């Protein structure tokens, strides 16, 4: 039986070099699978051809933009998905979708192995391999960059020696991953934490200091899902794309952070996610208006745990599924409009309205028409602080003994 290796193919250095390397090491055919996740940039027909030129027996490009937006970005919006309160899971949410399509290709082509180009230092090896284990444990997993101790310099040298078509060079060694949800840049001079990122590494965002005129936008949601922008109906994909343009033009969505990786190391990452950040901020603001206090407080903890599960590669795990069910149950009333101003790298929320709002003007106002019964407050305060009062009394008495 012929070994058929289904490869997660990005068109970049590691996976392009992996094609001829796997053919030699495993003595089999390579099926390269690439996904269009709205990353833009290079024409994917060129990516497909590069895989064939590198020796792939088949090269498949899947248009998965809408699927990615509806089934992966939307749950992230509902969960306000921010790892370490900053990173909107740009790469992390794309990996389970890639896993899904690789497994499908494995079934189509009678695949015996599945391969990825991740190193042993990153999170993606975990996301891919746990995903394969969860969805098709019969596929044997190969990770050439990790298992055969490839470094980036060695990969470049191998490509040059074997005439493998790549766009990477020793002078520009950044590792870049991008999709419609955002863009991630790492390695190179960024590995020195004191080096500031230069303007040329950014592609999704303009310099916040350019001084563009402020852009006011109204984002409307139904059940936690963005459905219109400035009154125009949009799909989730269209919402992300439009806000990528508009927020990106204002320099919104740039992140420079030191991230706690799953494998135990800290890593410096640069992210651009203008549309993602704008949508999550708008969604959070609408939740503030429409979700009851105790539920909102509890959901914030669930959101943080959800982001950790996704970051850690457990998209298909039972806890993630249960968290999804809880989060979905909270979105029933997250319907309404959020008005925000995008300007100079910042987002300012300046308007909120919802037919499901829990904000009661007559209870909140300090002016005439106030319906809040302040006579109830004194007893409430006494009861609220009673247990703390008793504990502090005990501690004072114990200190006097």
UniProtKB/Swiss-Prot annotation:
- Annotated L-aspartate binding lies at 119, 123-124
Q: Which family does it belong to?
A: Belongs to the argininosuccinate synthase family. Type 1 subfamily.
Q: What GO biological process, any one, is recorded here? A: argininosuccinate metabolic process
Q: Which gene encodes it?
A: argG
Report keywords, A-Z. Amino-acid biosynthesis, Arginine biosynthesis, ATP-binding, Cytoplasm, Ligase, Nucleotide-binding
Q: Which GO terms describe its molecular function?
A: argininosuccinate synthase activity; ATP binding
Q: Which reaction is catalysed here?
A: L-citrulline + L-aspartate + ATP = 2-(N(omega)-L-arginino)succinate + AMP + diphosphate + H(+)
Say where the protein is mainly found: cytoplasm
Provide the binding site for L-citrulline. 87, 123, 127, 175, 259, 271
Q: How the protein assembles, per its UniProt entry?
A: Homotetramer.
A GO CC term assigned to this protein in UniProt: cytoplasm
> Know the name of this protein?
Argininosuccinate synthase
Ligand binding (ATP): 8-16, 117
Q: Where does this protein come from, organism-wise? A: Corynebacterium glutamicum (strain R)
Cell division is among the record's keywords: no
Report the subcellular localization: Cytoplasm
């Amino acid at each position: 039986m012929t070994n058929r290796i289904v490869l997660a193919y990005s068109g970049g250095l590691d996976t392009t070099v992996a094609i001829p390397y796997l053919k030699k090491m495993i003595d089999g055919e390579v099926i390269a699978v690439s996904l269009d996740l709205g990353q833009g940039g290079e024409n994917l027909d060129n990516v497909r051809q590069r895989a064939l030129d590198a020796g792939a027996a088949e090269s498949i490009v899947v248009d998965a933009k809408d699927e990615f937006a509806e089934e992966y970005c939307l749950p992230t919006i509902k969960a306000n998905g921010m790892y370490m309160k900053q990173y909107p899971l740009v790469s992390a949410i794309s990996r389970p979708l890639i896993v899904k399509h690789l497994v499908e290709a494995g079934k189509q082509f009678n695949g015996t192995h599945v391969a990825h180009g991740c190193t042993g230092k990153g999170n993606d090896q975990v996301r891919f391999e746990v995903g394969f284990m969860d969805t098709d444990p019969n596929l044997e997993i190969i990770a050439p960059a990790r298992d055969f101790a490839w470094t980036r310099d060695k990969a470049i040298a191998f490509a040059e020696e074997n005439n493998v078509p790549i766009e990477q060079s020793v002078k520009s060694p950044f590792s870049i991953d991008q999709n419609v949800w955002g863009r991630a840049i790492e390695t190179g001079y960024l590995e020195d934490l004191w080096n500031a990122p230069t303007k040329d590494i950014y592609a999704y965002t303009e310099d916040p200091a350019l001084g563009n005129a402020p852009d006011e936008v109204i984002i409307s949601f139904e059940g936690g899902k963005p459905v219109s922008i400035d009154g125009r109906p949009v799909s989730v994909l269209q919402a992300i794309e439009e806000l990528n343009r508009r927020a990106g033009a204002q320099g919104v969505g740039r992140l420079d952070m030191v991230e706690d990786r799953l494998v135990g190391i800290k890593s410096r990452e640069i992210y651009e996610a203008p549309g993602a950040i704008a949508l999550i901020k708008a969604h959070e603001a609408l939740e503030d208006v429409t979700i009851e206090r105790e539920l909102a407080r509890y959901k914030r903890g669930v959101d943080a745990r959800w982001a950790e599960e996704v970051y850690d590669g457990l998209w298909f795990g039972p806890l993630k599924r249960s968290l999804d069910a809880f989060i979905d149950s909270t979105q029933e009333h997250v319907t309404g409009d959020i008005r925000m101003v995008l300007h100079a790298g910042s987002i300012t929320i300046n308007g909120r309205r919802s037919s499901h709002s829990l904000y009661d003007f007559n209870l909140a106002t300090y002016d005439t028409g106030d319906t809040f019964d302040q006579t109830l407050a004194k007893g409430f305060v006494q009861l609220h602080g009673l247990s703390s009062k008793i504990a502090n009394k005990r501690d004072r008495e114990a200190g006097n003994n």
